[in-house]
């Protein structure tokens, strides 16, 4: 697989020399320049791609997004850039593996731990947002109930006590 990444990096420069579009599947495997940069651990080139509007979740013919390629190469820098650009860490390739699974199978334990921590943080944040939304709905219902109790038969009380 490393030979594949090396040949992809060689193809990266020729792809860009030809003026390939940022999201175009530039090679026969359907890999964009971002896939190639992530696979080669080329964080600066990947950053440039991200700034030009690359689709960080575009999948190649293997179902792999750039985050899978970065995990396969063990590039913490590329993983960080992709996550900061809202790459989906729960996306599976055609074999059903997430980027965390790929990093683990390639022996990049730090990358796998990093991805697991990000996933846990995102899950916790999502649950907290959901709980906050439910709490706001409950509070709004209580306010509506209190408002209705202060009105007697659809009329407001006068300050002198008469209805």
Curated annotation (Swiss-Prot):
Q: Does the keyword rRNA processing apply?
A: no
A Pfam family annotated for this chain is: Ank_2
Annotated GO CC locations: cytoplasm; nucleus
Domain of life of the organism encoding this protein: Eukaryota
Q: Which SMART domains match?
A: ANK
SUPFAM superfamilies under this entry? Ankyrin repeat (SSF48403)
- ANK repeat positions in this chain? 29-58, 62-91, 95-124
| Gene3D superfamilies on file | Ankyrin repeat-containing domain
Write out the entry's keywords from A to Z: ANK repeat, Cytoplasm, Nucleus, Repeat
Residue window of motif Nuclear localization signal: 129-149
| Keyword Repeat listed | yes
What does the UniProt entry say about where the protein is found? Nucleus; Cytoplasm
In terms of PANTHER family, this protein maps to: ANK_REP_REGION DOMAIN-CONTAINING PROTEIN, ANKYRIN REPEAT DOMAIN-CONTAINING PROTEIN 37
Record protein name field? Ankyrin repeat domain-containing protein 37
Say which species the protein is native to: Xenopus tropicalis
Task: Give the organism's phylogenetic lineage.
Answer: Eukaryota, Metazoa, Chordata, Craniata, Vertebrata
């Amino acid at each position: 697989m490393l030979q594949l990444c090396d040949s992809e990096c060689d193809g990266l420069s020729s792809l860009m020399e030809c003026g390939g579009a940022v999201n175009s599947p530039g090679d026969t495997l359907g890999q964009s320049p971002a896939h190639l940069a992530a696979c080669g651990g080329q964080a600066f080139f990947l950053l440039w791609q991200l700034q030009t509007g690359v689709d960080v979740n575009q999948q190649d013919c293997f179902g792999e997004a750039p985050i899978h390629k970065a995990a396969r190469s063990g590039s913490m820098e590329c993983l960080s850039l992709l996550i900061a650009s809202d790459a989906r860490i729960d996306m599976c390739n055609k074999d059903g593996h997430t980027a965390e699974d790929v990093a683990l199978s390639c022996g990049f334990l730090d990358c796998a731990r990093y991805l697991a921590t990000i996933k846990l943080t995102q899950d916790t944040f999502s649950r907290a947002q959901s709980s906050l939304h439910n709490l706001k709905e409950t509070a709004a219902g209580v306010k509506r109930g209190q408002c209705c109790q202060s009105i007697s038969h659809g009329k407001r009380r006068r300050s002198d006590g008469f209805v």
